[in-house]
């Protein structure tokens, strides 16, 4: 958390409706007086997440009256151009596989850079200083735009380019998926964990039918595997305590 988070401060959360962004939304609601959310429609195969995010926002407000009082406007931006220039498994109906460069073909070049740039432009207009994202480089697929160095460099560029002092908050940067589940429990109790399991969406293929202990998804894509492995470690630690 940044040092100047407190009464009167506001935050804009990049909120996709997935596990990580739901946890970061809870984190922001626990810290800031006013919290708005931002989602993106960029032609993703798992576009069902846009439907899930509406349900998750409502469920989080119902879960905690204090959160409901802080939760402000929700924004959605269409970024069709990002999907048009990206030849990836997230925006094309192709099999998920590793590329010669060592990255999975689910990597959408520049996605987080574009997301955070638009988020900063919106935060500028809305008078919000803190921009919160679920980027992480501890337990991730190797995406370069999730790295701490990238986020820090982008914060400098955005502040120079907009003559503001935005703070890019990444509360998940140095924790793994098991710790992300534990953070959700600390923030909202088992009720928030259950909400994340049942209502959030992570699967790259957009599968909502199969129901696993960790939630809905195909169970085989990289996103599902990370979520499942993290949940298994989280549950094992709970049993041993």
Curated annotation (Swiss-Prot):
Recorded metabolic or biological pathway in which this protein acts: Purine metabolism; 7-cyano-7-deazaguanine biosynthesis
Binding positions (Zn(2+)): 203, 218, 221, 224
State the top-level EC class.
ligase
Which Pfam families does the protein's record reference? QueC (PF06508)
What are its cofactors?
Answer: Zn(2+)
- Per the UniProt entry, the signal peptide is none
GO MF entry, a single one: ligase activity, forming carbon-nitrogen bonds
Any idea of its EC number? 6.3.4.20
* Keywords (A to Z) from UniProt: ATP-binding, Ligase, Metal-binding, Nucleotide-binding, Queuosine biosynthesis, Zinc
Q: Do the record's keywords include Ligase?
A: yes
Q: Which residues bind ATP?
A: 15-25
Reaction catalysed? 7-carboxy-7-deazaguanine + NH4(+) + ATP = 7-cyano-7-deazaguanine + ADP + phosphate + H2O + H(+)
Which Gene Ontology terms describe the biological processes this protein takes part in? queuosine biosynthetic process
Q: Which InterPro entries match?
A: QueC (IPR018317), Rossmann-like_a/b/a_fold (IPR014729)
Co-factor binding details? Binds 1 zinc ion per subunit.
Instruction: Tell me the protein family, please.
Output: Belongs to the QueC family.
**PANTHER family hit by this protein:** 7-CYANO-7-DEAZAGUANINE SYNTHASE
Instruction: State the function annotated in the UniProt record.
Output: Catalyzes the ATP-dependent conversion of 7-carboxy-7-deazaguanine (CDG) to 7-cyano-7-deazaguanine (preQ(0)).
Name of this protein: 7-cyano-7-deazaguanine synthase
Q: Which organism is it from?
A: Azorhizobium caulinodans (strain ATCC 43989 / DSM 5975 / JCM 20966 / LMG 6465 / NBRC 14845 / NCIMB 13405 / ORS 571)
Gene name in the database record: queC
């Amino acid at each position: 958390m940044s040092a100047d988070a407190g009464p009167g401060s506001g935050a804009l959360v990049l909120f996709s409706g997935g596990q990580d962004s739901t946890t970061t939304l809870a984190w922001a609601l626990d810290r800031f007086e006013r919290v708005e959310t931002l989602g993106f429609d960029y032609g993703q195969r798992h576009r069902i997440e846009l439907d899930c995010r509406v349900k998750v926002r409502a469920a989080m407000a119902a879960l905690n009256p204090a959160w409901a009082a802080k939760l402000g406007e929700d924004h959605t931006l269409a970024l069709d151009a990002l999907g048009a220039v990206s030849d990836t498994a997230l925006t094309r109906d192709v099999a998920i596989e590793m590329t010669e460069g060592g990255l999975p073909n689910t990597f959408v070049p520049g996605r987080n850079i574009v997301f955070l740039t638009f988020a900063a432009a919106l935060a500028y207009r809305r008078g919000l200083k803190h921009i919160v994202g679920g980027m992480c480089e501890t337990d991730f697929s190797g995406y370069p735009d999730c790295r701490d160095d990238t986020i820090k460099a982008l914060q400098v560029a955005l502040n120079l380019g907009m003559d503001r002092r935005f703070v890019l908050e990444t509360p998940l940067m140095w924790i793994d998926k098991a710790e992300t589940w534990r953070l959700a429990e600390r923030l909202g109790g088992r009720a928030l964990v259950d909400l994340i399991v049942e209502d959030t969406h992570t699967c790259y293929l957009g599968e909502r039918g199969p129901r696993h202990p960790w939630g809905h998804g195909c169970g085989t894509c990289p996103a599902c595997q990370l979520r499942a492995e993290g949940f298994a470690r989280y549950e094992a630690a709970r049993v041993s305590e």
